[in-house]
Amino acid sequence: VDTVSSKGLRRNENRCILCGRCVKACAEIQMNRVWDFTGRGSTAHLTSDMYDAIGDSSCVQCGTCVQLCPTGALSFQTVLGRGPEWELEKESSICIYCGVGCKIDYYKNKEGLLVKAMGHDAGPNRGHLCVKGRFGFDFVQSPKRLTKPLIKKDGAFEEATWDEAIGAANAGA
């Protein structure tokens, strides 16, 4: 059964092999304990917060469980329809959201669009990302994104060159 579990995650129970990686990652890495198993033997299955839908649970949508899932039972909603996994090109970078400096691997499709972000197994994050680092990468493709520096003059922002912007920043403006 393939279900849209939340805005960011998708779950397919038929692919789950009950390995427990998602349960362990959520409990020991994220310290959240959203995932657990219910039932015994052939009735065992993965559940979140005692049968709550993942979107209604205490899940923080970090995606660590998806990154560690070996079968694709948990997947990213944002990747669907963006091209086959094997055609994605990886580029390593540093997350721009806060000052921690998490290492991150971005994946681009054939059109050059960023479609996925995964934690890089190095640096301060050791392969793990917060929800902003994991799902907040698509703003770079927005037509509303600023591409030139702006300087505030007489109460309004005006386009400037990089040299002017750096000079204004150095001057304390």
Residue map of PLM features:
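N-terminal export/assembly segments and adjacent metallocofactor-ligating motifs
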Residues: 1-173
